[in-house]
Amino acid sequence: TYAVDALVDVLPLLDQHPVLVGDRLRGPLEAASMDRLNFLGNRFLSAVASAVHRTDAADVCSGCWVMRRSVVEGLRLNSMGFELEAELFASLAAMGHAPTWVRIPYRARKGEAKLTSILDGVRILRKLVVRRVMEARKTHL
């Protein structure tokens, strides 16, 4: 679904930006790459992530993340499913690393989708909120 050549093109940006994330929602989206429910759900979750973590989340559910090794080594993650991207975003926001969003093409998936829209959306939403609450508790204790 992600074009490898698009990823190669963004690598030089790592010199100035420690975290790059592919923004599928600002396109271009290939026809049939994402249905309306998933598109709207991604927009909603990204808006929630932006509000809760107070940093821009153009496409919080993107699976295309590129970051410097020094940033990766500071991450503490425990997610196993589709909420991993939300946890990545929340952890980076807590570390003060606002992602740089790079528009990338997104193609239609070959084969069956693994995502269950509503259930995974709820898990992602929960992860975004829980990580923010936990971070706030650490700060105020």
Which residues fall in each region the model found?
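Acceptor/aglycone-binding surface of glycosyltransferases and processive sugar-polymer synthases
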Residues: 4-82, 108-119, 124-125
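C-terminal, non-catalytic tails of nucleotide-sugar-dependent glycosyltransferases
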Residues: 124-141
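Short active-site alpha-helical segment characteristic of glycosyltransferases
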Residues: 2, 84-91
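Aromatic/hydrophobic pocket-lining residues that form π-stacking "cages" and hydrophobic walls in ligand
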Residues: 10, 88, 128
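Short, hydrophobic secondary-structure boundary micro-motifs
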Residues: 22, 59-60, 101, 137-141
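Catalytic donor-sugar/metal-binding loop of nucleotide-sugar-dependent glycosyltransferases
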Residues: 55-56, 77-80, 89-107
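Short, charged/polar low-complexity linear motifs in solvent-exposed/disordered segments
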Residues: 91-93, 117-119, 134-135
